[in-house]
């Protein structure tokens, strides 16, 4: 992911900064606790595509 692009992108919900998780290929919004996927080098910034970081896998 291009560092210049990361400087420009913000969370589409809160407009806050994002952190790049290289291993998971996601952009993380710590304020909203959401992870936006990066597919083929393209960040998918749709709120309905974000993964909720508050949900523990295997729980409802």
UniProtKB/Swiss-Prot annotation:
Ranges in coiled-coil conformation: none
One GO cellular component term: cytosol
Pfam families: Trm112p
Domain of life of the source: Bacteria
Gene3D superfamilies with a match to the protein in the record: 2.20.25.10
Family statement: Belongs to the UPF0434 family.
Name of the protein in question: UPF0434 protein mma_2578
Protein's organism: Janthinobacterium sp. (strain Marseille)
